[in-house]
């Protein structure tokens, strides 16, 4: 965190999920039965993959549909007929695409259910409990609320390792300690550390680029492949229901404790932040003089950009040049 006069200026207050609303439910509960009936009628599915997010390009919804198709192609027709992808999102969106058209073109032979209308938190909890796994493979994501809600409900998740999604999968370093991010190591998208919680199946991006806009000049855009996403779906499919449940419940335990993504911790952190601010408040002067050099803007402190710059193997490149020149 930045410091001024040896006092930090920022205090992180993480997202917090209400564990009384988002919780594990029995399949026999009325609301679960009703939501199943609304979604599937009388059809029973063995595997339900749930996507709960917006239809915008960075969410990679089309990639999710194609990955689901690739997953189903690796099953027998009978097995695939008992799998369904549930998309709680807009069918069409200018910032995204025409998802029904994508489904028709890329996944015509398998079941995909769309939910466009808003539903209550209680109904959403039922949805997570109906799901076998929840998926979100955004290429950049501030947090990923649906993943946190799913974890709190005890439902396993599939995520792309980027942005705030990586904060929800219990990553640890080689010594088993939670990963510490700083100005030089701001993301684990390079898979420097591959340890993670059992409730998550992470996918490490294979393409890392820079995106940006006027209000957000730059942000890392990390893209994972639909092929590896299909493998991640298969991971949860092949695991026994009993083991999946154990993995999911470990995720809820983590979220309620060291993970900290629960509403109680969010409120406590907010109280601490307010107390610290009040106790360490530094009144502003009536006026101050600033030069252009005082304005930091979007410059990163100490020329850090949040990622480790790799060392280029010049000897390897020189060897490649020699091989090319030898052909002349």
Positions of predicted regions on the chain:
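Nucleotide-activated donor-binding/catalytic signature segment of Leloir-type glycosyltransferases, i.e.
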Residues: 91, 96-122, 175
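Aromatic "clamp/platform" in nucleotide-sugar-dependent glycosyltransferases that forms part
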Residues: 139
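Short hydrophobic beta-strand element within catalytic cores of glycosyltransferases
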Residues: 156-159, 169-170, 176-186
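Conserved donor-binding/catalytic core segment of Leloir-type glycosyltransferases
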Residues: 41-59, 65-68, 85
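A short helix/loop element that forms part of the nucleotide-sugar donor recognition site in Leloir-type
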Residues: 23-42
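Conserved active-site histidine-acidic residue motif and adjacent donor-binding/catalytic loop
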Residues: 29-35, 109-131, 163
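Carbohydrate-associated surface elements
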Residues: 16
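C-terminal amphipathic helix plus adjacent low-complexity
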Residues: 200-328
